[in-house]
Amino acid sequence: MDTETVSPNFDDIRPLNNSEVKDAIEKLVANEDFERALRYIKPNLNWEEFSVAMRACKTKEEFKSTLAYDAVMTVAKNTTFSLTISGRSRLPKDKAACTFISNHRDIVLDASFLNVMLYDVGYGMTQVDIGDNLLIRPWIETLVRLNNSFIVKRGVSVRQMLEVSKTLSAYIHHAIKNVNESVWIAQREGRAKDSDDRTQGSVLKMLSIGGDKDNLLLNLMDLNIVPVAISYEFDPCDFLKAKEFQMKRDDPDYVKCQRDDLLSMETGILNNKGRVHFTITSPINDSLAKLDKDMEKNELVSAIASVIDREIYKNYRFYPCNYVAYDLLNGTRRFQEHYGPKDKKQFEEYLQGQLDKIVLPNKDEAFLRKKILEMYSNPLKNYLTTL
């Protein structure tokens, strides 16, 4: 679906309109940093041929379904054993717009992988939220808005936060109701670095405040929320996340910088992820309709978050490494029927290899090992709560 998002109220956050595509493509074709970044993914890229193909794209839809699709599938081919999706029968009928809310593992690929698979099953690609903290270079903002992303403003003052949230929420409601285009948003601000996936109440409150009803629950139901469970066999950034945990433990004032975000994006895109699976879960409006819309606000938000979390926990796909990690972390053999000696040996070798990549002056390997084991066992731990 390729509809203009023309409202001037959203000019600073919306995706590009089709009338802006030509200028955006010219900017990208002339940008050496953009070319350099693409060569990481496609080392043998013929830039002249690619530039011609870029200029042939007259709409966002053409760009997304050809060049962007090809780039994402190249990443999948080079860095995954498989990329699969299930639950397509649960997608809204007649391609009705919805809000996909998922757990969050990879800065770039969560939404990118979801979109190529939705395209393959005939549903169509979504609009995607991206934090402005990741727009480290001007060409990145041009690219993501060309690729139908809208901008989430992160670094604003407390005084500005309410207004920024209202505008963002109003835009999402606009995309769903007026443009009839689905939206992807993570269940929390930033990745769940310990893989303990929990929907943040602040995200749900933000989604509700741009609605046209005076009730939080009804406004969220208007967005037709569909949870998505994302399951990576291996997280290429697990060692970076563990390193950050130790740095924050040792220095409570530690704050990561732009270089860290760039490294995480690059590491996530270029390195092995093994099997990757997306499960489309059931739309939750029927479950939300059973809640008391007049419940105390924070209690209601918590109840809605639990509905989303439960769908994600129940539909997570587990690999041998998840079971091995749980047993190693807890000193048990509870899940030994789900893996063999070879699986255990391979994961232990993988774990040590990731730990060896961490360079810190006071490296606490026992702590780092525990953190990585938690990343792989927490989804299983959360699943067990649904039984």
Which role fits each region the language model picked out?
Residues 1-98, 104-115, 119, 141, ...:
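Membrane-anchoring hydrophobic helices of lipid-metabolizing enzymes
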Residues 46-52, 211-220, 225-231, 293-300, ...:
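C-terminal intrinsically disordered extensions
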Residues 61-63, 71-284, 341, 351, ...:
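Soluble catalytic domains of membrane acyltransferases
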Residues 67, 164-168, 300, 304:
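Soluble or luminal CAZymes and related metallo-dependent hydrolases
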Residues 250-327:
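A cross-taxonomic marker for long C-terminal extensions/tails that follow the last structured domain
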Residues 312-387:
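Long, low-complexity C-terminal extensions of enzymes
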